[in-house]
UniProtKB/Swiss-Prot annotation:
Keyword list, A-Z: Iron, Membrane, Metal-binding, Oxidoreductase, Transmembrane, Transmembrane helix
SUPFAM superfamilies in the record: Cytochrome P450 (SSF48264)
Membrane topology label: Single-pass membrane protein
Protein name stated in the entry: Steroid (22S)-hydroxylase
A single GO cellular-component term on record: endoplasmic reticulum
Record's catalysed reaction(s): a C28-steroid + reduced [NADPH--hemoprotein reductase] + O2 = a (22S)-22-hydroxy C28-steroid + oxidized [NADPH--hemoprotein reductase] + H2O + H(+); campesterol + reduced [NADPH--hemoprotein reductase] + O2 = (22S)-22-hydroxycampesterol + oxidized [NADPH--hemoprotein reductase] + H2O + H(+); campestanol + reduced [NADPH--hemoprotein reductase] + O2 = 6-deoxycathasterone + oxidized [NADPH--hemoprotein reductase] + H2O + H(+)
Parts of the chain that traverse the membrane: 12-32
InterPro entries: Cyt_P450, Cyt_P450_E_grp-I, Cyt_P450_sf
Length: 506
């Protein structure tokens, strides 16, 4: 553990000068544009500020505020010392200065729901400018209003329940087996890397019909790895920096997408039905009036969204299950039952009915998302003055609904830092999943993750084949940390042992 923390701390120290320079540049530019210094007061006049009952809190250091403390590395199964101390001192709603802006931080389940349900009326999505610079101005992550609704509608139609059943379920199972069949008995490897390989190949296939293992697919994957390092780095566009390299990789990735688009347009113009490909690229070209730039950003952002969070959630599930043999046993029993029913039907592939029978599997998925918190918090901006629980939150301020703080709240979840999938078992006769209005792993409201059902399908199918065919243990100690996104410092090294078919059928 000490070595792990030392490694993470050294990375933080390496990036501190870059982060500080970026913040200084941002502050200098912003303050110069503001008149009368109102920026420092969140755009409120002294008279207005005097009438307001702002949440308690502190501004932190000049220029940098409390950003460094907020982003300090900590285990993914905790909210971190910064949040713990601030909640203890100020309560679940407090003010701070983060990412160069006056900010209200919410660890309150009710306020978080209120924020997500009032998207476009009182709040709007507001990610740092550098995110838009690297994902593209037409990325769904940064769009607001009608443009976001149009992009989201295209994604939802492509990921409809009909397509999930008929197209995506077989594809998910095929890509799962491609990964698992390559695992050698008693071999050791990075589970996180394998999860990334699985989700990337799946998304590349369904976005642009790129097959796993092909040279172009592997080249795209390498560029994507460089691209991702820049997404989580300081936004300094200087030669040699991760952000600069990521922008170059973005251009290379867009070049691949653009070539695929040109090839597809040519095929469509010839009306060659034999070469029609049922992927997102074809869907966007035929089902929308999007411009070329919009399609490029849409495909890049969905490659990012559909790969990164799903792979981390899957790695977290493997990690949590390794430490809970009882859950693995119940999971295996559920999937042995499904496999037996498959054989009785004379089938060898999963059906949609099989998927809907994975009740305990969904409990495991929910608990993984609750405890691991792949998406820790969301960036929002207040667009109208808000009054909530006696506090005034001024228009123009940033507000961060911290989903992880709610999911790890002991007043909402008993023993919240323990992996307990049984907490999601319904106590009713229906045998379904227990519901919780405070559980928001995919966000909510009009910006609810368009790929949430696909993400759950991916995890369920992968776990089905994993527990039927393998046992596993950690090859060396590792655990997920937040820095600033969730990651395993060592890549989650595991050793796998294949289960004999006779054992599987018992």
């Amino acid at each position: 553990m000490a070595a792990m923390m030392a490694s993470i701390t050294s990375e933080l120290l390496f990036f501190l000068p870059f982060i500080l320079l970026a913040l200084l540049t941002f502050y200098t530019t912003t303050v110069a544009k503001c008149h009368g210094g109102h920026w420092w007061r969140g755009g409120t006049t002294p008279a207005k500020r005097k009438r307001m009952n702002l949440p308690p809190g502190a501004a932190g250091w000049p220029l940098v505020g409390e950003t460094f403390g907020y982003l300090r590395a900590h285990p993914a199964t905790s909210v971190g010392r910064f949040m713990e101390q601030h909640i203890a001192r100020y309560g679940k709603i407090y003010r701070s200065s983060l990412f160069g802006e006056r900010t209200v931080v919410s660890a309150d389940a009710g306020l978080n729901r209120y924020i997500l349900q009032n998207e476009g009326r009182l709040f709007e999505c507001s990610y740092p400018r550098s995110i838009g610079g690297i994902l593209g101005k037409w990325s769904m992550l940064v769009l607001v209003g009608d443009p976001h609704r149009e992009m989201r509608a295209i994604s939802l139609n492509f990921l409809s329940s009909v397509r999930l059943r008929a197209v995506l379920l077989p594809e998910v199972e095929r890509h799962t087996l491609l990964v698992l069949r390559a695992w050698l008995p008693s071999s050791t490897f990075s589970a996180q890397h394998q999860a990334k390989k699985f989700t990337f190949n799946l998304m590349a296939k369904n976005i642009m019909s790129m097959d796993p293992g092909e040279e172009e697919t592997e080249r795209l994957r390498r560029e994507y790895i460089t691209f991702m390092k820049g997404v989580v780095s300081a936004p300094l566009n200087l030669p040699g920096t991760p952000y600069w390299k990521a922008l170059k990789s973005r251009a290379a990735i867009l070049g691949v997408i653009e070539r695929k688009m040109e090839e597809r347009v040519e095929k469509l113009s010839k009306e060659d039905a034999s070469v029609e490909q049922d992927d997102l690229l074809g869907w966007a070209l035929k089902q929308s009036n999007l411009s070329k730039e919009q399609i490029l950003d849409l495909l890049l952002s969905l490659l990012f969204a559909g790969h990164e969070t799903s792979s981390m959630a899957l790695a977290l599930a493997i990690f949590f299950l390794e430490g809970c043999p009882k859950a693995v046993q119940e999971l295996r029993e559920e999937h042995l039952g499904i496999a037996r029913r498959q054989r009785l039907r004379g089938e060898c592939k999963l059906s949609w009915e099989d998927y809907k029978e994975m009740v305990f599997t969904q409990c495991v998925i929910n608990e993984t998302l609750r405890l691991g918190n792949v998406v820790r918090f969301l960036h929002r901006k207040v667009i109208k003055d808000v009054h909530y629980k006696g506090y005034d939150i001024p228009s123009g301020w940033k507000i961060l609904p911290v989903l992880a703080a709610v999911h790890l709240d002991s007043s909402l979840y008993e023993d919240p830092q323990r992996f307990n999938p049984w907490r999601w078992k319904s106590s009713g006769s229906s045998g379904g999943l227990a519901q919780s209005s405070s559980f928001m792993p995919y966000g909510g409201g009009t910006r609810l993750c368009a790929g949430s059902e696909l993400a759950k399908l991916e995890m369920a199918v992968f776990l089905h084949h994993l527990v039927l065919n393998f046992r596993w243990e950690l090859a060396e100690p590792d655990q997920a940390f937040v820095f600033p996104f969730v990651d395993f410092p060592k890549g989650l090294p595991i050793r796998v042992h294949r289960i004999a078919q006779d054992d599987e059928q018992e």
